[in-house]
């Protein structure tokens, strides 16, 4: 059984601003040059309604579904299934908690459910362990004051 990946990041924003940056503004900071299905010039859209997809639209107008929204509590919490470039039957789960602190907002990301991937679970989990560092570094960079722990 694979342990979930846990990453913590503090950003100098209110909880609502941090949440909005992570969701509705994802296209502005996500490292599409290295972490994309459709390429660097694609567009990302993050849903606001349970069951709706996280979509990457390529230059050719074709969509790739990265996951589906499970929970959406603005400024506090979100959860989504995650399967970019894979079949939905192989979806893992990402959860992000946004907690207001004196320093800004602590963002606690947990990515789990890798066992569904069978024999590739360890390799995929290890890839995401490092991949989230880059992704969250880009997210922090969009706030101008990165502080990944």
What is the role of each PLM region?
Residues 29-30, 72, 82, 128, ...:
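Tryptophan-centric aromatic hotspots in well-structured domains and transmembrane helices
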Residues 47-54:
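Short coil-to-beta transition motif at edge beta-strands of beta-rich domains
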Residues 18-22, 54, 69, 80, ...:
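Hydrophobic pocket/interface hotspot
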Residues 1-19, 57, 92, 99-108, ...:
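Aromatic-glycine hotspot motif
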Residues 112-149:
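A conserved amphipathic terminal alpha-helix motif
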Residues 23-24, 74, 137, 144:
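Residues at helix-coil transition
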């Amino acid at each position: 059984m694979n342990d979930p990946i846990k990453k913590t990041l503090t950003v100098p924003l209110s909880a609502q601003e941090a949440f909005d940056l992570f969701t509705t503004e994802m296209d502005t900071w996500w490292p599409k040059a290295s972490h994309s299905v459709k390429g660097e010039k694609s567009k990302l859209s993050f849903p606001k309604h349970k069951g709706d997809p996280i979509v990457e639209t390529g230059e050719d107008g074709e969509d790739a579904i990265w996951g589906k929204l499970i929970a959406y509590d603005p400024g506090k919490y979100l959860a989504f299934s995650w399967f970019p470039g894979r079949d939905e039957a192989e979806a893992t789960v990402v959860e992000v908690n946004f907690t207001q602190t004196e320093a800004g907002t602590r963002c606690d990301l947990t990515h789990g459910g890798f066992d569904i991937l069978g024999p590739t679970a360890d390799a995929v989990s290890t890839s995401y362990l490092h991949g989230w560092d880059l992704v969250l570094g880009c997210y922090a960079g969009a706030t101008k004051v990165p502080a990944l722990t």
